[in-house]
Every structure is written in C-alpha cells, then in structure tokens.
C-alpha cells in the first residue's frame, strides 16, 4: 500500500508539469525549435520556402509579361477597358470609389456601415474632413 501523501504529491507534480511541457512544445514550434537541442538528437530540416524578392524586378517581369489588349491595371494586373474599371486589390476588405474623369481609388471598408469609405471620400472632397 502506498502512502496517500506520496500519491497526492506525485499526482500534483504530474498535473503541474504537463502544461509546462506543452508550453515548451508550443515555443519550439513558434520559434523554429532546436534552441535547447542536445547532442545526439537529430533535427530534420525541411527546405524552407524562399521569400519573394525585395526589389521591384519580380513585379516588373509579371507586368511586362502580362497579355492585355486594353488597359493593364498596375495594382492587380487585371486587364480592363478603362483605368477606372480596375478592381481593388483586396475586394473583400476594400471599397472602390470613382472620383470622375477616369480616376478611382480603393480604401478600407471600415466594417461598420455599408459605403462608409465612399461617404468619407465625398466628405473629404467637400473639405469636411
């Protein structure tokens, strides 16, 4: 028969150390792991995806290689008939407002009121913002 104090201590230690071990696993995954690696353990490195270039050459090559017989939108590389027909880059979170004379701008939807961006643009045009 085991002593109840020893059993209780063992159970409490197990319960207290399990979340700590889980947290260290979380930090290993978040920060790339291997920080506390000991010799003898083998760490398999997967080939990491390469970041896109930090200069404009990739974009320029995409722009120059795009096939478009009308107007090629610089922000989305969409082919449209007129510049003000260009879609917003992030249509799910942006609204487009046409300013007239073939000019259109995109801005955050705001999230509260339908057409909020358009109303703000109109207020700014009137000098109220």
Swiss-Prot record:
Disulfide bonds: none annotated. It comes from the Eukaryota. Residues 1-22 form the signal peptide. One of its GO terms (biological process) is ERAD pathway. Keywords: Signal. InterPro entries: LCL2. The keyword Signal applies. Belongs to the LCL2 family. Probable component of the endoplasmic reticulum-associated degradation (ERAD) pathway. This is Long chronological lifespan protein 2.
